């Protein structure tokens, strides 16, 4: 695997794990407001991001390269968001992630 491709895969792995943490933090916010259905949906989204990261990790390892996870900062999620604001935050994060994926 070329260095450029490995870097792109490493960046994508980090992005997927960042998305996991963002969805989990949003799920915590939903749970804190007794929005259990919303929280469950957000946790499911977080779990999917872990699956995505693992696929990139496995693909990289299968090709004899060594994946590296980059720096993951704590998600910036405000306390007290409304249900609408939680979904808007999830959508904004997903749009950012998709735009990054299409640019690399």
What spans do the regions from the language model cover?
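Conserved small/polar residues in nucleotide/adenosyl-binding loops
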Residues: 101-104
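Short, contiguous, pocket-lining structural segments
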Residues: 1, 11-18
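Charge-rich amphipathic alpha-helical interaction elements
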Residues: 25-28, 73-75
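All-alpha RGS (Regulator of G-protein Signaling) helical domain and cognate RGS-like helical scaffolds
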Residues: 9-13, 33-35
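Residue-level signal for short amphipathic helical patches enriched in basic/charged
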Residues: 30-33, 93
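Conserved alpha-helical segments that form or flank metal/cofactor-binding pockets of metalloenzymes
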Residues: 32-71
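Acidic/His metal-coordination segments adjacent to aromatic residues that form catalytic metal sites
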Residues: 1-6, 71-92
